Amino acid sequence: MRKWREKANLHQRLQAMAQNKTTPTTQSVAAFLEAFVDNEAKKADARALIEHMEAWTGETAKMWGPSIIGFGSYHYVYASGHAGDAPVVAFSPRKAALTLYVYSETEKSKAALAQLGKFKMSKACIYVKRLADIDLQLLRLLCEESIRYISEHHACSCRLPQA
């Protein structure tokens, strides 16, 4: 009986690990900002980012997981067979910095990053202390490149605005 319980526990843990934790929620974006962001300047930056990203993507801001504000969605399938959905562009107003989630591996994206302004970067995120530290037109270009790249490779809800 004990071995069966251990196997069942292991199976549940493996299933939980395989599930994508960053999924759309019904949590209100405004309520999240009020509850999660205690710095008024960061809250103002977050509201400005929401306004810009909604305009740039044509999508309404939506909560993804407990702390990511995403715009649009796309479906991905890895070679391993793991599949899921993710926001096309997103950000999280964390304590240390605004964390931006945009695809940055195209040539245009790399050129924009070189001139974006003051930020730090990890493999998948751009960290910005204040929106005033970066060029918003270059951030727009990064968002457009994300939409372009993702819509070429995945089923994507976002469309580039018509010129």
Where does each model-flagged region fall?
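Charge-dense, helix-prone N-terminal extensions
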Residues: 2-163
